[in-house]
């Protein structure tokens, strides 16, 4: 196999995000549902025989020289001893500093695609172990489904069968301004003692359950977040922030006119995915 083109890297929304504590090493403990969305970046992979990792921006958005895509490819080389290389073309559509997991999803799709392109035959669990060092959200994007996530992001329960999320459309708003995740988690006013919930609690009201504990801090640090939420609420929608922002979203329960949104905002109507588009590219370990 010489190439894999048009490989999707879907976004996620946090349907809720509760901070339940903080470890001695400073990492925050959370509970959340990460939901896959049909808004995605697209990656293209061409095998190289010289072992080099190269990357090309195809969308006009400047990318750092050592972003998560490159780091994921190098991590897979190092973990397996693979001597093959790759040239990666990136069509970047997902906004940065949005709380939608764009960089983490790119890294996960890179691991999945190179596992196939380089014929490594690693299992889903093996790739997730490699992904842990790339970022807390990367293992989720390898699990194959939307998921209930706990701990610092390492405890992942796919939402399948009886717990599968019902189909739903959403309006997603990304204000022009972004937010740095660390600035929110370091804020002295962040509440870190949310009571633990269960999947059964969440299942009683999939798209209305809980809250985002990071949202009050984000609204104070970046007023555009509150402005976007207020705009969606004025349309009689139930809006909240995803992740550490600055993107916000609301389930669509009616037809709405999006033309009144400020021109600098990125406004998009999306649907949830029933499974990751690359789910079947990985095999699960036998029990």
Swiss-Prot record:
Q: Which gene encodes it?
A: ispE
Question: What InterPro entries does the database record attribute to this sequence?
Answer: GHMP_kinase_C_dom, GHMP_kinase_C_sf, GHMP_kinase_N_dom, IspE, Ribosomal_Su5_D2-typ_SF, Ribsml_uS5_D2-typ_fold_subgr
Catalysed reaction equations from the record: 4-CDP-2-C-methyl-D-erythritol + ATP = 4-CDP-2-C-methyl-D-erythritol 2-phosphate + ADP + H(+)
Q: Which Gene3D superfamilies has this protein been placed in?
A: 3.30.230.10, GHMP kinase, C-terminal domain (3.30.70.890)
- Can you tell me which residues form the catalytic site? 12, 137
A biological-process GO annotation: isopentenyl diphosphate biosynthetic process, methylerythritol 4-phosphate pathway
Q: Which NCBIfam families match?
A: ispE
Which protein family is named in the record? Answer: Belongs to the GHMP kinase family. IspE subfamily.
Q: Does the keyword Calcium apply?
A: no
Organism's domain of life? Bacteria
Q: Write the protein's name.
A: 4-diphosphocytidyl-2-C-methyl-D-erythritol kinase
What is the top EC class of this enzyme, as a single word? transferase
Annotated EC = 2.7.1.148
- List the Pfam families: GHMP_kinases_C (PF08544), GHMP_kinases_N (PF00288)
Pathway connected to this protein: Isoprenoid biosynthesis; isopentenyl diphosphate biosynthesis via DXP pathway; isopentenyl diphosphate from 1-deoxy-D-xylulose 5-phosphate: step 3/6
Residues that bind ATP = 95-105
UniProt keyword list: ATP-binding, Isoprene biosynthesis, Kinase, Nucleotide-binding, Transferase
Q: Write out the GO MF terms.
A: 4-(cytidine 5'-diphospho)-2-C-methyl-D-erythritol kinase activity; ATP binding
């Amino acid at each position: 196999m010489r190439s894999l083109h048009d490989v999707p890297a879907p976004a996620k929304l946090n349907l809720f995000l509760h901070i339940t504590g903080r470890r001695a090493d400073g990492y925050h403990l959370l509970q959340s549902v990460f939901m896959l969305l049909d808004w995605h970046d697209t990656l293209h992979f061409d095998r190289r025989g010289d072992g080099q990792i190269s990357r090309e921006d195809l969308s006009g958005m400047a990318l750092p020289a050592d972003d998560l895509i490159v780091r994921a490819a190098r991590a897979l080389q190092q973990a397996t001893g693979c001597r093959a290389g790759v040239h990666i073309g990136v069509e970047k559509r997902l906004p940065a500093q949005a709380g939608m997991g764009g960089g983490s999803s790119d890294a996960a799709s890179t691991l999945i695609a190179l596992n196939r392109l380089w014929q490594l035959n690693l299992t889903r669990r093996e790739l997730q172990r490699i992904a842990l060092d790339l970022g807390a959200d990367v293992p989720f994007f390898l699990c194959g489904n939307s998921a209930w996530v706990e701990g610092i992001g390492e405890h992942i329960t796919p939402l399948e069968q009886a717990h599968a999320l019902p189909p739903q459309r959403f309006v997603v708003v990304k204000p022009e301004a972004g937010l740095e995740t660390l600035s929110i988690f370091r804020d002295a006013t962040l509440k870190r003692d949310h009571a633990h919930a269960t999947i059964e609690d969440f299942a009683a009201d999939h798209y209305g359950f809980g809250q985002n504990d990071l949202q009050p801090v984000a609204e104070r640090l970046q007023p555009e977040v509150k402005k976007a939420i207020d705009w969606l609420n004025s349309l009689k929608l139930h809006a909240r922030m995803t992740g550490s922002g600055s993107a916000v979203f609301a389930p669509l329960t009616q037809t709405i006119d999006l033309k009144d949104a400020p021109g600098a905002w990125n406004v998009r109507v999306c649907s949830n995915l029933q499974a990751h588009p690359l789910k079947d590219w990985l095999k699960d370990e036998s029990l």
